Design a protein with these regions (language model features):
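Short, conserved catalytic/metal-binding micro-motifs enriched in Asp/Glu and His
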Residues: 35-43, 57, 84, 88-96, ...
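Short, charged alpha-helical motifs in flexible N/C-terminal segments and linkers
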Residues: 1-9, 93, 102-166
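Amphipathic alpha-helical
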Residues: 22, 159-198
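Basic, alpha-helical interaction scaffolds
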Residues: 27-94
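C-terminal helix/juxtamembrane-tail motif
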Residues: 220-246
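Short, conserved micro-motifs composed of acidic
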Residues: 2-32
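Conserved, non-catalytic sequence blocks in retroelement Pol enzymes and Pol-derived host proteins
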Residues: 2, 44-53, 68-78, 96-106, ...
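Hydrophobic alpha-helix feature that most strongly marks membrane-spanning transmembrane helices
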Residues: 40, 62, 66-69, 84, ...
Length: 246
């Protein structure tokens, strides 16, 4: 099969722009590329991807606002769950540990949608979440993360997940057994903020009655009611200006 250099793309985690020659064609490195529906940038910040998600979700919130007066409450709720929050449910494990700035953008869209649904323009975001009996997008993504870890635990995860989250074999059993291997890291963005590093810590926060489940469906039902507390990621940590994360 003859190669088509026009379809070649080069993405490097490097500040400098590089060029390579293939079949006398020059391929320049790009700042971001879309792969399987996820826009990956050279800094692995996923800012481009999340901004695109926010733009699409915001457009649908605007459409909902225009038509809200013509819809019933159930119809407005259906629009939220089917066409707005679903934008943030595709491949969340890849991009979920993004910046606080991006998390605020997502929450702002979610908050505005809830205000339109409940016609409530006085309550706080947390009060709206309580009224809706729903978590934030980030909290829902944390639920999905621990669900994937549970699949690994019971042997129902795809092989690639077993490569990312390696099982730690122990000669004895502990009540709070850590079955996902913890890695030593040296950096923040590609180390302590990586999903492979944070996953075991987040698993520790899961209630014991959920961990002790043996059935995936039963685990999913229980984990829906779990609101993560004291999550160790940068999004959830308290930040004090001129001091840093606490």
């Amino acid at each position: 099969m003859k190669m088509n250099p026009d379809k070649f793309h080069l993405l490097l985690s490097n500040r400098k722009e590089l060029k390579i020659n293939i079949c006398n064609e020059t391929i320049s490195s790009s700042k971001h590329e879309k792969l399987l529906g996820v826009t990956i940038d050279s800094k692995l910040s996923f800012e481009e991807h999340i901004n695109n998600l926010c733009k699409k979700a915001s457009q649908k919130v605007n459409a909902l606002a225009r038509l809200a007066s013509l819809m019933s409450f159930d119809q407005r709720k259906l629009i939220l769950n089917s066409f707005i929050t679903t934008h943030f449910s595709y491949c969340p494990l890849v991009w979920m540990f993004h910046s606080r700035h991006l998390n605020n953008k997502i929450n702002a869209i979610h908050e505005r949608a809830l205000r339109i649904i409940y016609q409530d323009y006085k309550s706080s975001f947390q009060e709206l979440l309580n009224k809706d009996n729903s978590p934030t997008v980030h909290q829902r993504n944390l639920q999905k993360l621990v669900t994937e870890l549970f699949k690994i635990k019971i042997g129902e995860a795809p092989e690639i997940m077993n490569e990312i989250f390696q099982i730690e074999e122990r000669p004895y059993n502990l009540r709070n057994e850590v079955f996902v291997k913890r890695h030593n890291v040296r950096t923040v963005r590609y180390g302590t903020e990586a999903v492979s590093f944070l996953a075991p810590k987040i698993w520790d926060l899961v209630p014991e009655d959920c961990k002790n489940e043996t059935d995936l469906i039963a685990f999913k039902e229980k984990i829906k009611n779990w609101i993560p507390d004291s999550c160790p990621c940068r999004i959830c940590k308290k930040y004090v200006q001129n001091l840093g994360f606490l």
